[in-house]
Amino acid sequence: LFEESRYAEALELFTEIIIAFPFGDYAAEAYFWSGELFLAQLKYEDAKLSFLSVVDQFPDHERISDSLYKLGEIERVQGNATEALSYYSKVITNFAESGAAQLAKKSEEIVKEQSNLVE
């Protein structure tokens, strides 16, 4: 459904998963992919809420690093450099070996350059 841009149907399915399995891995995945769907539609506040749900409700889930990175990207796109850098720092510090950390390092450099925050 995601690849076919059938976002409304996919979001409905993810909502059903969250309702049926509110505390399990399925819910964390559903929140994460809901965030991705909202991002694809440029619905940043909805995406932020979805990624924050992963971070707040599932602190040990494998999607934490990706969710923190996505939150940083949302803040970057919205022009919130300080908040973006804070999220990137969390990813880099806590998930140094992850793919998200590598992406966060690149995004961090870009934000610092754009904000004249280069050390």
Give the residues covered by each predicted segment.
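Acidic, polar-rich low-complexity tracts and alpha-helical solenoid repeat scaffolds
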Residues: 1-119
